[in-house]
Amino acid sequence: MAKHVVIIGAGVIGLSTAYALIKAGQTVTLIESETDVGMHTSFANGGQLSYRYVSPLADAGVPLQGLRWVGKNDSPLNLKITPSVHQWSWLAQFTLACNRKTNRINGDHLLRLSLLSKNMMNLWRQKGDLGDFAWEKSGKLIIHRDSKSFLKANETADKQFQKTLTPAEIIELEPSLKHIQSQLVGAIYAPDDESADCYLFCKNLLQYLQTQPQFNLCLQQSVQYFIKQDNRITGVATHQGIIQADDFIVCAGNGSRELLKSLKINVPILGLKGYSLSVKYPQTENTVPKINVTDYGNKIVYAKLNDQLRIAAMVDIGYDTAGLRENRIKALKKIIKKTFPELPQVDSAESWFGLRPSTPKGPPILGKTAYHNLWLNIGHGSLGFTLAAGSAEILTKLITEQKSPISLTGFTR
């Protein structure tokens, strides 16, 4: 029997979930507080669909590195300690997860979900509903300038799907990296990884959904509170009235924690600030990458999205209330110029920041809450676009009372 499902949050996670539910014959009401969809973390993210490279941020050595990077504008990670009890709790859980064993366990959970997501994205594209969203099977090249990090990456690489490259092989594959060849010690190449424009994907999802009579979009409406009866949610209250439904899914990213507090549901999600630059893709060949590149040491990703080059970087913890930090953008541009000195218009690139809704251990939170018709699809961090289709499929299967396509071990609070 078809259900009416309310989804809270219209970023790539909420829209993907709406699409999967509509395809499964359900009725969907999508609630979004902004004037349009995809306006937060989904708007100008890195654009990489890195299905084979999903290692959590929490890893051995990261806390010590973070302390060494304090106050350095060009460092991959900036940390500002605040009086927030939530931040302290999140950092404590993050620190406990910063060891090789836990990193590998959570990395395996993420890989399980990302491979499901890859399969679902391929199926969605084959349906022909989603138009052009700058999708390319461009491959991903993870370059290393440090021998220790490269040896670790080589140990954990899946040699069936990933290749180890020497500096000479790196330049042969991606000649635009010629200016830093002397700094490179090696790379991991994943030829099957993809890239796409997340915001364009969101807009195309919405365009399709709005052709479906079972879909309703409520923009500029914030959920003020849940209406509950025993262990069920019967509705949500917005300033425009009460919306009732059979099931409710929270896909509200960074807003999820405050929203769920009224139900005494605590979720360990913290907004980790990241930055991106968008610059016109140059016509001159071998000026910038044709394939996805991740500069591992600097934590910078490069992706070609139609006629744009998207460059995304950095993690700032404790800066969730501030706007664009110009000193970080300036430092990012300086690194880009050293890596790709022939790239024009870096100084005039369009700057953006977003807050990645992140769990301490890395995997998102998926599944049912103590309220048996309230579901969570939150905490995807920097992998929201990569994991969106798989997460949507899981929630759709669960809500339609079917078995999850993968084990949900590791995806709970």
Regions inferred by a protein language model and the residue ranges of each:
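Rossmann-like flavin
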Residues: 89-207
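Glycine-rich FAD pyrophosphate-binding loop
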Residues: 23-43
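C-terminal catalytic lobe of FAD-dependent flavoproteins
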Residues: 296, 340-413
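N-terminal Rossmann-like FAD-binding beta1-loop-alpha1 element of flavoenzymes
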Residues: 3-30
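Helical element adjacent to the flavin cofactor pocket in flavoenzyme catalytic cores
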Residues: 183-239, 243
